[in-house]
């Protein structure tokens, strides 16, 4: 797979320079505005889950099965079956997921947009989506592109004799690219110069080893042909997808049981990718001028490899060939490094010429599965036990294609597996009667006399709910996992204070559940959120505004055995600007981390502004530090923090001992009035954030400030309440 050192950033002479061109380090506040209703052609009231329920699922699958062997002249099917290329399409649609921030994946159909639609690793997948268009057009909005891409991969596997683990719908489309994902800083396709350090240590914020690849270079690190060195790259990227060694082997071998790679001629024959193609190409890219440009003359990755003798049928032949032969390095017609079986007969069928056969071939990264000691043990076991291999691939494929969907409660359709899987972050179903309005009033009274401060009530609820990530729908208040490992021990959650608050809340919960009649119970998850509501109401009352924070019961409490400690460790904030916390492992400026966190919480610029200034007014800062608490009346929910931040009578200067902390001094006397962090001062320095901060700091904004704070607060508290949508 050659990079050809192509720069994806051409500099058009007449292109207007953007603000980002002038100021490359400008804070990307715009990521909070992506996927607004203005870009949605279906309107605000469209409910995909309801539309999906109207889908004739059986008929759709039947149409997909027919498509598999309905070869089209403009893009003929290899081996007379489109299944392998649809498996690749589904794999590449979902395989961009990474655990560190939950971004990537197939949950929104992003493969349709740049940069993914034009990545070198996705070469000619545009043809697969065009083959699907007649079916998408037929079924309309009852099936999203995001769901269709994955379902088609499943049907492809089934049509080739494989039994899948199941399928769940529920992936709603968006209509523009995700701009919040960090794919890397390289300026050439397949570049690696910005993402590695030391002994080839991959940047902790990235998953793929090369710019424009889903995973790793199939020719080995930087095209070296070194199958032993490839093991480190493979583990680095697959581990960041939450896959273990067995899942890695199963996925690679399972995927390479089907189809072929295409390298009939040098890659110089390929035309521009979809985003760079001329307008008359109508979004199709990589048009080749070699021979017919398709079929036997296809040029995709540059590799020319067919792994098995039954490339359109499930078998164990990948492992049979891997272990049967010794391998020697060779080059494809395109010049890519690959491996051919020594002293082998021509047993591999040609994809388009009937009666023609080839020697078995493998990728460099395929040989890694045999010769790496740990991968080798697993591969040998799968070779000797085909049923174990099939089971492992089915489960790993389901995980790959569903990992970013969140809890099972979001799953739709008749093929949802009944088995509960630990990576789905399971929560027990509510099997008791929920509290009513009178119960909520009584519980609020108990909370008011509990001895817990407003800061403790609000801070604990925030700590619980703000773990939510809109990217992969993980975290949130439901489950009350803040009382379980690892969350209970996170430094940002102040373990000692948290233990004290939880003990008090558990006492209130126990008293209520023991005395309530009619089978009523309250979960700790609900009580934590209700406690936060009480704190907010008290803070608003202190500001002279009476408000009732909306509360919806229905959460339940997860168990420790339902909580994968290692998996949840990825949710621990290194920096949390909402609580003015900067951890020891923080690697980005606090204001950048704040915007990133706000985006994961699905907050708009106004919601972010009113939330953080209100939380500063209440002071839920970790350790009770006063940074950013720019008010003489902490605990009162008013706009005084913003008033003081925007006060020109204060001059801000950095503190020499801490690059994140600043002193606000009186311009006349030089006296220190306040301290603040970068996460505070950004609301005065960034022109967009300042414009919104000014609205909330105005004299007529008293009630609006509280009202908008409550709305944003409830949004975060209910972020994982998919049952309320």
Swiss-Prot record:
Tell me what organism the protein belongs to: Janthinobacterium sp. (strain Marseille) (Minibacterium massiliensis)
* Assembly and oligomerization: Homodimer or homotetramer.
Kindly identify the residues recorded as the active site. 92
Q: What is the lineage of its organism?
A: Bacteria, Pseudomonadati, Pseudomonadota, Betaproteobacteria, Burkholderiales
Catalytic activity of the protein: H2O2 + AH2 = A + 2 H2O; 2 H2O2 = O2 + 2 H2O
Q: Where is this cross-link: Tryptophyl-tyrosyl-methioninium (Trp-Tyr) (with M-241)?
A: 91-215
What is the gene name?
katG
> Which residues make up the binding site for heme b?
256
**Gene3D superfamilies assigned to the protein according to its UniProt record, in alphabetical order:** 1.10.520.10, Peroxidase, domain 2 (1.10.420.10)
What Pfam families does the record tag this protein with? peroxidase
- Record-given protein name: Catalase-peroxidase
